[in-house]
Amino acid sequence: MGRKNSPSAKKELVTLITNYEEAKAENRQLYLDADQLADIADWYASERKFEEAQEVITYGLKIHPGNTDLLIEQAYLYLDTQKLQKAKKVADSITEEFDSEVKLLKAELLLNGGKLEEAQWLLSTLADADELETIIDVVFLYLDMGYPDAAKEWLDRGKSRYAEDEEYMALTADYLASTHQVESAIIYYNKLIDKSPFNPSYWMGLVKCYFVQEQIDKAIEACDFALAADDQCGEAYAYKAHCFFYLNNSDTIFN
């Protein structure tokens, strides 16, 4: 499932998870819609808290049996935990076969089996194929599954319409970084920082590029900017530690 990226969506999700965990700790009933439970499960899975994710999905399907959002999350959870056959079985049980999220799930299952052409055909039938959100989902799907050429086809699909859109620029930067076009990626991340200087993900994009180039001082500086934007950015702390280790300056980590 797509992750919550906007600040307002993230804040709403944090509140939702807090309410859920408080109710659970107090053994108190808390009614939540299926999509809310799916979002909570998705977050747990993204944090690799697979048992908690399964607990939410199991509870959700008891009060919302057969719900598509929850079944999609169940299938992805099986994928995350290397249970491919169970994921396929759940995907096959979903009745809303024309739903875009269902098609994305089934495409991932096909790619897991090396069936690129079948996945390409399925994704070509997406009703919202020209929407930016869909393009982003498909590009990352292909990149994650190791098909950069297929990802490039979908990236190009949105260029004429979305070239100046910040989300599309971020997608382009991530694609360039993922395909080792580091210099071009740096140019895009800097453009994004000019647009949104307090977005830590853009700074982290720069960090990774500089680290690959072994420009460690620049990587550390970018880490500091990422932490200035979000002092809870664990990835920035981790990369900063890697940088100091690389410089054989391990004492600095503990000072």
Language model segments and positions:
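Register position in tetratricopeptide repeats
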Residues: S46, D80, N112, D144, ...
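Canonical positions in the second alpha-helix
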Residues: G60, A91-I94, T125-L126, R157-G158, ...
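Short coil turns that delineate tetratricopeptide repeat
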Residues: P65, E97-D99, A129-E131, Y162-A163, ...
